[in-house]
Amino acid sequence: CRLYPFLLVKKGSSLQLGLHKSCCFIEDKQPVLADIQTYAQYLKNRLNAPSFISAIRKNPEIAADYQENVELITDLKDIFTKAHLPKLNKLTLKDKPRIEGYLLKSKTSLSAYHFADIFIWKDLFQIFWLIIEDELCIFYQDKIGMFMMLPPLGKFKPTVIQKCFEIMNVYNQNSAVSRIENVAREDTTKYSRLGLSSKLKDTEYLCLRKDLIELAGKGFKSKRSSCNYFVKNYRGDFLEYKDSYCRDCLKLYQSWSRQRKDRHQDSIYQQMLEDSFLSFQTALRYYKKLGLSGYVVKIDGSTALTTGKKIKACTFGYPLNKETFCVLFEICDLNFKGIAQYIFREFCKKLSGYKYINIMGASDLENLKTVKLSYRPKREIGVYNIYQK
């Protein structure tokens, strides 16, 4: 009724916005075509709201069958498509067992394949999941558009890939935004056979845990020296993380972030630090529920106003499979020489049973890449994004 004299009209398999020509108002005022089209565009924009799309999905009878006394003004194809797409489920912690069931079958060493790494970005993206032909599909959406954070989890099915791109294309004004992220290099051939293109997103580094603990040989001389310096000059306590440390760890991140920004003026890097803080905050808030492991280093931070040891470094991570553990965060007060090397070595000591440590990628930052390579990784894993041509 609020649309009248405009109507939602079904014609064949399409949805149209029509004008009831027999309406008294239309017959009396006889508005010019330009005014009708302007208002129709306004209505089209309003009808594109999620609340309306949900309403038409639940009540398809809202749209009447086409009649000759109705003039079709504009096509509502995008709205019709959205209304008939599968409903996307918003990701919550309650979905963790379902998601993990699929992730555990993937048997990959890529850092993105853990529920924690999916969930911690919830304050930057709306995160949705959907089951298509028994495959789990995870979508991220923000103001720019929608993409898949992971490839569909399950058996590789071309029909599922096609459906996923159809869903993303509906939500994205520019189909170039539609993509599937975090695809392993060895899987890119499957996508190329479907006429899709791949682009290197990042390279992740896997180190032998044994090497990171022993720091033996010339290749690790500087790391070994840094650890020795820290142990000799600071009375640090290496402690398992607990919830009461949360506030101090968040303060440490903010201090560390300021230090990094002072050293690196690149605007993209600085934005990454701000985005990462939101994910770090979420990780600490849901630390236990996400299955994270973490440790802190406390050092005597006594001043004229405070006494006692303060948290000057913290680190967190999660297991990817039986062989590989991923270090997700490492935050350190850079004023304490050797603290980064020390907490990393001590964390690795605690990870008994794992052969490899995934230290993640460098995100196209050369200084970070240099640091990663200085730990002499044994394997490099190419991480790709998949696009439509």
Which residues does each PLM region occupy?
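Amide-forming acyltransferase catalytic core, primarily the GNAT-like/NAT-type
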Residues: 82-135, 139-140, 278
